Design a protein with these regions (language model features):
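Extended, charge-rich alpha-helical interface modules
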Residues: 5, 26-148
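C-terminal motif of bacterial Sec signal peptides marking the signal peptidase cleavage site
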Residues: 21-24
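Bacterial N-terminal signal peptides that target proteins for export
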Residues: 2-15
Length: 148
């Protein structure tokens, strides 16, 4: 082979590698860990409903609750999975985790209102309503168990 053909092959392999990387980045579900795959799926299609259900099951099964302090995205707020998991886990959360969860729920409205495209007004509204309700529940649980 000539120097030209090696260079040409290297360029082709490089371009293919870049293409694969970009395609992985373009799809939220490929780039995300399994437990977070449903967090970015916000429409009402059967696929997204299933993905959100699977994500919720994985969050609920995580005994370490490592997800509690991971920062959410606007689509994670809109999907409702994390907020719903906080609602379901509120009796198991430590006082620190309850405080963090409530701050996250309280942060949903500004995050959703500031979301740049991709969310419908109905998705934003539903996410905000759920977060407000769960914030109240988390606050009540915190007040019941975590008084200073």
């Amino acid at each position: 082979m000539t120097g030209y053909s090696i260079s040409w092959h290297a360029r082709i392999v490089g371009l293919l590698g870049c293409g694969l990387l970009l395609s992985a980045c373009a799809s939220n579900e490929v780039a995300m860990p399994a437990q977070q795959a449903g967090l970015g799926c916000v429409d009402d299609s059967a696929h997204c409903v299933s993905e959100r259900g699977n994500a919720l099951k994985m969050l609920m099964a995580d005994k370490s609750r490592s997800w509690v302090k991971q920062p959410p995205t606007a689509t994670a707020y809109a999907s409702g999975v994390r907020i719903w998991a906080f609602k379901q886990k509120k009796h198991e959360l430590t006082c620190d985790e309850l405080s963090h969860a409530r701050r996250e729920a309280d942060g949903a409205a500004p995050a959703l209102r500031g979301a740049k495209g991709g969310l419908t007004p109905a998705q934003i509204s539903r996410g905000i309503m759920l977060a407000q309700d769960v914030s109240k529940e988390l606050g009540n649980e915190f007040g019941r168990r975590c008084r200073a």
